[in-house]
Swiss-Prot record:
Keyword annotations from UniProtKB, A to Z: Ribonucleoprotein, Ribosomal protein, RNA-binding, rRNA-binding
Name of this chain's protein: Large ribosomal subunit protein bL21
Species name: Xanthomonas oryzae pv. oryzae (strain KACC10331 / KXO85)
PANTHER family: 50S RIBOSOMAL PROTEIN L21, LARGE RIBOSOMAL SUBUNIT PROTEIN BL21M
Protein purpose: This protein binds to 23S rRNA in the presence of protein L20.
InterPro entries: bL21-like, bL21-like_sf, Ribosomal_bL21, Ribosomal_bL21_CS
Pfam families: Ribosomal_L21p
UniProt KW Ribonucleoprotein keyword: yes
Subunit structure, as described in the record: Part of the 50S ribosomal subunit. Contacts protein L20.
Record flagged with keyword Ribonucleoprotein: yes
Gene Ontology MF term list: rRNA binding; structural constituent of ribosome
HAMAP family linked to this entry: Ribosomal_bL21
Gene that this sequence comes from: rplU
Length: 106
């Protein structure tokens, strides 16, 4: 069984036992988290699809928090002797999917 969930403004296709990195969540490492915004559920019988499936949820365990590799940004203006360098490291939360519960379409 798989599901498509929404967190941090992004959509992720997940299955039980998978590990993935999502935008930073304010949950301590080792705790469980429940995602209620599930857009799609699929299995061998078919799929359930909708804006949000009523009663559907995905539970996950927070494995760790971290920061991604640095992305370097350079803004350059030719012939003006101007160059601006900037770096950014995005915070993320690594989660492991522990369960997918089905539901009815809203």
């Amino acid at each position: 069984m798989y599901a498509v969930l929404v967190t941090g403004g992004k959509q992720y296709r997940v299955a039980q036992g998978e590990t993935l990195r999502v935008e930073k969540l304010e949950v301590e490492a080792g705790n469980e988290i429940k995602f209620d915004t599930v857009l799609m559920l699929g299995d061998s019988d078919g799929i359930k699809l909708g804006d949000a499936l009523k009663g559907a949820s995905v539970t996950a365990k927070v494995v760790a928090h971290g920061r991604a590799d640095k992305v370097r940004i350079i803004k350059f203006r030719r012939r003006k002797h101007h160059m601006k360098r900037q770096g950014h490291r995005q915070h993320y939360t690594e989660i492991e999917i522990t369960g997918i519960a089905g539901g009815d379409k809203k």
